[in-house]
């Protein structure tokens, strides 16, 4: 919530409030949706009400979907977060990012909960040239899965094509399954990658993928809204009792068949590189792949670590620990306390800041920004 103190005239306009929000870290109002594959991790950890089904998605870092709360003292106003993007794109994004994306927010954090649930649909996202020519979008949905948690006997992510797969054989098997024939043998054609908590799996567009059951994923991705082409939905129907759509023609045109078993393990699974190690903690780069325009860094500290800007808006999530605090190095904004699994945005105009653990316990924060 953005607190808006009164001016000397004892009033603050809506535009003034957006201007204030563009210069300090803020959280948006999250919302949660059920899905056929949904689980129960978010219900337990976020103390959500029983909805009679499950919780599959959480949108906590998506300005296109979320809202802001503006506290004027005598009243609280809820407003679309996109209004901030439209009103103050340079302050929010930074000049460099604004020059590339205009009034579009390029980073998305959302959550996928399959804990005690089911696999997501097997899917692929369109290549840049495909989404431009077919859907007139500027850029595509490159993404990644950061594992907040994993449980059960063999949690996994399906990722890339198994070495030796013949494209025509896989497409024929998918078409047969779509026509009501033999179910698609996913593990014959797609790599099944074992995962654990804090693994980071990178998913550039064109890579076949889905998260498996018993995982809790923080999805870090680019945001051209939602373009997901489904190959296989495990023979199930949606919550409304109807089959979900399959997009085999789009899929066949976008699957990158060279991303086989060896390539996936070499390029897309836990490509962690040390950035900084000192007495106050560590910083590692966890992604994303060079084909993607986002960088992600994990800060681990029991004390305080500085965060320097690279000309880009930052999006953060506390992936381990009870709470962390973001503080301005120049007192440019009031401290923001971030709780476990919460997401926040730090505008470029907020300047340099620090991540600290208020009680001395270890915290881990994942940070995403647009790469230089």
Residue ranges and their predicted role:
Residues 1-168, 233-274, 296-298, 372:
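Transition-metal
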Residues 73-74, 213-247, 276, 311, ...:
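Non-heme Fe(II)/2-oxoglutarate
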Residues 111, 137, 143-146, 192-193, ...:
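His/acidic/aromatic-lined binding-pocket segments of jelly-roll/cupin-type domains
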Residues 114-119, 127, 150-154, 207-226, ...:
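Ligand-binding loop in jelly-roll beta-barrel domains
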Residues 149-202:
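Intrinsically disordered, low-complexity linker/loop segments enriched in Gly/Pro
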Residues 181-234:
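Loop-centered beta-sheet repeat module
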């Amino acid at each position: 919530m953005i607190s808006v103190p009164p001016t000397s005239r004892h009033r603050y306009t809506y535009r003034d409030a957006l201007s204030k929000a563009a210069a300090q870290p803020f959280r948006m109002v999250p919302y949660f949706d059920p899905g056929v594959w949904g689980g129960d991790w978010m219900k337990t950890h976020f103390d959500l009400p029983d909805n009679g089904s499950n919780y599959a998605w959480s949108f906590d870092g998506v300005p296109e979907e979320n809202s802001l709360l503006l506290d004027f003292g005598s009243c609280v106003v809820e407003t679309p977060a996109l209004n901030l993007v439209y009103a103050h794109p340079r302050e929010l994004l930074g000049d460099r990012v604004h020059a590339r994306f205009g009034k579009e927010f390029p980073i998305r954090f959302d959550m996928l909960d399959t804990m005690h649930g089911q696999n997501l649909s097997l899917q692929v996202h369109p290549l840049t040239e495909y989404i431009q020519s077919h859907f007139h979008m500027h850029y595509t949905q490159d993404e990644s899965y950061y594992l907040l948690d994993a449980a059960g006997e063999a949690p996994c992510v399906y990722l890339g094509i198994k070495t030796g797969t013949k494209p025509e054989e896989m497409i024929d098997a998918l078409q047969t399954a779509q026509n009501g024939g033999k179910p698609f043998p996913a593990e014959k054609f797609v790599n099944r990658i074992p995962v654990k908590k804090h693994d980071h799996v990178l998913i550039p567009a064109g890579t076949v993928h889905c998260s498996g059951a018993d995982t809790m994923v923080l999805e870090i991705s680019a945001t051209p809204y939602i373009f997901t082409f489904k190959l296989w939905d495990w023979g199930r129907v949606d919550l409304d009792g109807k089959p979900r759509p399959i997009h085999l023609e789009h899929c066949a045109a976008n699957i990158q068949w060279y991303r086989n078993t060896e390539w996936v393990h070499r390029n897309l699974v836990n490509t962690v590189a040390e950035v900084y190690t000192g007495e106050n903690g560590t910083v590692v780069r966890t992604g994303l792949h060079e084909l993607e325009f986002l960088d992600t860094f994990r800060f681990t500290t029991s004390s305080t670590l500085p965060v320097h800007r690279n000309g880009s808006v930052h999006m953060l999530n506390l992936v381990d620990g009870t709470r962390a605090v973001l503080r301005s190095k120049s007192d440019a904004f009031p401290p923001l306390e971030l709780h476990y699994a919460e997401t926040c945005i730090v505008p470029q105009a907020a300047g340099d800041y620090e991540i600290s653990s208020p009680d001395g316990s270890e915290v881990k924060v994942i940070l995403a920004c647009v790469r230089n």
